[in-house]
């Protein structure tokens, strides 16, 4: 496998006479567009001119705190990982792509040697090098170098912005696969932020007949309803309201909750999911807001409610692109804000995403 876009120590330079620029995270809420030296092109690599980059919640965490979960930014790092672009150059052994192809990039490079990789669980590889996850540089840049097998050609009717949206959509698709969502699966989703919404879109594409979204924010719930939620339920942040809210969820679902997705990851959201899910059902933990939670596991175990988790995704890009090509999923309404790749716009875009509000997906057009 090639090196990919991981020139971790390079901060300045030119690439074939053209300055390659990137958005470097230098400190808390400090981003600066600076030169970025690309690694040399390996035989199985491609050079991609990046055209669309979305801002993810993990990018915002890095921007605001210089860390996300256990990943800590200790030195300047190029930010970003949701991306698509146009092939500019291919390595000597690349056969499936040519210059000019439009591609969506899967951002994680696994080792392909460990037992997890050999078992097909490459997303859990301990040697993973993931765009914009320290210490690996990201994709908010004019150009990146990336392994060709992680670049997926876009169908003619799928835009570069939609290609960049394959990354968050992959989270929803992987979650639905882990939970075995199908045409007879009634789905509850805790949280109507970006990940809750893509999980809803994925569940519908997998055939879920009824989907209910729960949130504390009326504005987000209204967006979920517009995007196709069968019902929406506003809840409080007060744990004392849990039993009443679970009863409301169950009456709204009518036939029972087969699968619950917690796309938030708080004590209350996970407790709600566990209590609302029918006996023999499944709860999938997607959001990881809290590292530790106190939740009612014993009653859930007594009802044989299975609990599964996800970490990122694996083998999802081809299905993402097919759902987008066929129209089974439309991610365009999720893109609420667009910015150019200028110093001013980079700063404003991250502040916009950090504020939340009516911003769902903030997208750069390079």
Swiss-Prot record:
Enzyme Commission code: 1.1.1.366
UniProt-listed PROSITE patterns: ADH_ZINC
UniProt keyword annotation of Metal-binding present: yes
Keyword NAD recorded: yes
One of the protein's GO biological processes: L-idonate catabolic process
Keyword annotations: Metal-binding, NAD, Oxidoreductase, Zinc
GO MF assignments: L-idonate 5-dehydrogenase (NAD+) activity; zinc ion binding
Cofactor: Zn(2+)
Residues in the signal sequence: none
One Pfam family in the UniProt entry: ADH_N
PANTHER family listed in its UniProt record: L-IDONATE 5-DEHYDROGENASE, SORBITOL DEHYDROGENASE
Name used for this protein in its record: L-idonate 5-dehydrogenase
Organism annotation: Vitis vinifera
Organism classification: Eukaryota, Viridiplantae, Streptophyta, Embryophyta, Tracheophyta
């Amino acid at each position: 496998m090639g090196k990919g876009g991981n020139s971790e120590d390079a901060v300045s330079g030119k690439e074939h006479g053209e300055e390659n620029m990137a958005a470097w995270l230098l400190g808390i809420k400090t981003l600066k567009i600076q030169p970025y030296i690309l690694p040399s092109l390996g035989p199985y690599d491609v050079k991609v001119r990046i055209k669309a980059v979305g801002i993810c919640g993990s990018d915002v965490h890095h921007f605001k705190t210089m860390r996300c979960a256990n990943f800590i930014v200790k030195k300047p790092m190029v930010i970003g990982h949701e991306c698509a672009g146009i092939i500019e150059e291919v390595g000597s052994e690349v056969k499936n792509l040519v210059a000019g192809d439009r591609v969506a990039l899967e951002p994680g490079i696994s080792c392909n040697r460990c037992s997890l990789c050999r078992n097909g669980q490459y997303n859990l590889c301990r040697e993973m090098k993931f765009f914009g996850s320290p210490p690996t540089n990201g994709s908010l840049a004019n150009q990146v170098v990336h392994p060709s097998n992680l670049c997926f050609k876009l169908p003619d009717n799928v835009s570069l912005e939609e290609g960049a949206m394959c990354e968050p959509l992959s989270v929803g698709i992987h979650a639905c696969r882990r939970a075995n969502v199908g045409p007879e699966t009634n789905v509850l989703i805790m949280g109507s932020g970006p990940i809750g919404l893509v999980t809803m879109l994925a569940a519908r594409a997998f055939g879920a007949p009824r989907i209910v979204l729960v949130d504390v924010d009326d504005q987000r719930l209204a967006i979920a309803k517009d995007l196709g939620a069968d019902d929406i339920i506003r809840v409080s942040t007060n744990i004392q309201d849990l039993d009443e809210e679970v009863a409301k969820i169950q009456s709204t679902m009518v036939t029972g909750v087969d699968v619950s997705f917690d796309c938030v990851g708080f004590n209350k959201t996970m407790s709600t999911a566990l209590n609302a899910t029918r006996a023999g059902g499944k709860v999938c933990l997607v959001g990881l807001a809290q590292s530790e939670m106190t939740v009612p596991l014993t009653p859930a175990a007594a009802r044989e409610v299975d609990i599964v988790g996800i970490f990122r995704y694996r083998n999802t890009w081809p299905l993402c692109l097919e759902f987008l090509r066929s129209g089974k999923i439309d991610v365009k309404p999720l893109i609420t804000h667009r910015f150019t790749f200028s110093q001013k716009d980079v700063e404003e875009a991250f502040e916009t995403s950090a504020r939340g509000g009516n911003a769902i997906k903030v997208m750069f057009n390079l």
